A protein has these predicted regions:
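Hydrophobic transmembrane alpha-helices of multi-pass small-molecule transporters
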Residues: 1-5, 117-213
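Short amphipathic alpha-helical coupling elements at transmembrane boundaries
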Residues: 22-32, 67, 101-105, 112-116, ...
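Alpha-helical transmembrane segments and, especially, the helix-loop junctions at the ends
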Residues: 44-60, 76-107, 126-133, 258-271, ...
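Conserved small/polar residues in nucleotide/adenosyl-binding loops
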Residues: 333
Length: 333
């Protein structure tokens, strides 16, 4: 909830003082129109791999993606889908991602070994996705107008990206972004002190529905877990395994269901990891393989559920419905 509040305050403050427009102008002056979507996807992949958090990546890139969409005529939901897809790809492979840590610890394998197996599965899909985004962007010409690049207004986003890549806590990154955006806005005349406060208040208000949905979904799912519903389904999923392929399918189904119920892939991995380890040992599945399956399917499901933090965050920052973003995620997933 605190991350949602801070993200809303930062996004609106940065927008009010011109940081989003300045960053969009910078991106559009570097990349041709047909490569903008693919460029945002690659940036999201790189940032997420570097920082190990998909939510932090979405917070940093979603406003820029929406700004690019507005100037080029591409749907906002499409560009937000690009950001979410890249963020989940990087989260899946990052060495410092909590999902990678939990998956490898529960399966008893080394992170480097899991990465080698994981990337063989994920990289071809990422390449195809990047090519798909180039194809989607082929209809975007160079007829749009770009304003002058105001470097001082780009500074807050650069600081947010650099500090995130350096591994600084997401909340600290957002607080720094809010303060720096406010200072730049005051110096450049973007707003006065009351305008800064009003921007933060508006950003937090815009996140209100998102916060309520998150709290309600979390409470409902915890009630299901507390009453044994998740354990019962897991038992049913694992009771009829007959082959190695069936065991791998059960591991994938197990983590997918746990993620659907918890809307948190780390918690889902903690719950399903020990059971997946038992299945892998019984059917002699390589720990690197089982860890990769757990991490891949946890990130896959987390990235497409409309009540997950990633889609809710992207939807809140872009002022669209999570369902609108999902129709573009289907192209990737």
């Amino acid at each position: 909830v605190l991350i949602f509040i801070l993200a809303g305050a930062f996004a609106q403050t940065a927008k009010a003082m011109g940081a989003v427009d300045a960053t969009v102008n910078l991106a559009m002056s570097i990349l041709p129109g047909n490569l903008l979507a693919a460029g945002i996807f690659l940036a999201a992949c790189f940032i997420s791999i570097s920082v190990g958090t998909s939510v932090g990546t979405i917070v940093a890139l979603a406003p820029v993606a929406v700004g690019i969409a507005d100037k080029t005529g591409m749907p906002d939901a499409l560009m937000l889908g690009v950001v979410v897809s890249g963020a989940m790809f990087g989260d899946n492979l990052s060495f410092i991602s909590d999902t990678t840590i939990v998956a490898t610890r529960t399966q008893g394998c080394n992170m480097n070994d899991k990465f080698k197996v994981n990337i063989r599965i994920a990289l071809p899909i990422a390449i195809l996705t990047g090519l798909l985004y180039v194809l989607i962007g082929s209809g975007v010409g160079s007829g749009y107008e770009t304003g002058p690049i105001e470097w001082i207004k780009v500074l807050p986003y650069l600081v947010v990206l650099v500090t995130a890549i350096c591994g600084v806590n997401v909340m600290m990154v957002l607080i720094a972004g809010i303060i720096l955006s406010g200072i730049v806005g005051l110096l450049t005349g973007g707003f006065d002190i009351w305008g800064w406060n009003a921007s933060m208040g508006l950003g937090i208000t815009n996140m209100g529905e998102l916060i309520i949905v998150t709290l309600l979904a979390g409470g409902m799912l915890e009630m299901i877990r507390y009453n044994g519903g998740i354990d019962w389904i897991i038992l049913k999923l694992t009771s009829r395994i007959r082959s190695t392929k069936g065991a791998e399918g059960s591991i994938a189904a197990l983590i997918s269901f746990a993620n659907l119920c918890t809307a948190n892939n780390t918690i889902a991995l903690i719950m399903a990891g020990p059971i997946a380890k038992d299945i892998a040992d019984r059917f002699k599945i390589d720990p690197r393989r089982s860890a990769s399956l757990l991490d891949i399917f946890s990130c896959f499901v987390q990235g497409i559920i409309p009540y997950g933090a990633q889609l809710l965050m992207a939807a809140g920052l872009g002022h669209v419905s999570p369902i609108e973003i999902m129709q573009y995620l289907s192209l990737i997933h």
